[in-house]
């Protein structure tokens, strides 16, 4: 039986597994691997802090993901398909690993974050 997301160790498992899928994905992997050239040793701990703060309000994250994604969008236009694939991979990963209130919350927050980014980034493309 799967357990709920309960602590940072769970966040690390979720995010590491999720980004392993992202890196291998035909739709969005190239954005991370070839365009952004993500340094995973640096990026993953930032994402652990981000999601730990999103779910458990730890205050450990103090970046601005919108600025990073707006810059990336200037390099390669991000599309609704990119965001939908990100959402799909995130949801699948949560569902594979966890079950419970925080797992549901993680999926809801991921969808909210993706939706806000889509609105801001895609509307920026139409200016």
What are the language-model segments listed below?
Residues 1-127:
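Core of compact, soluble alpha-helical bundle domains
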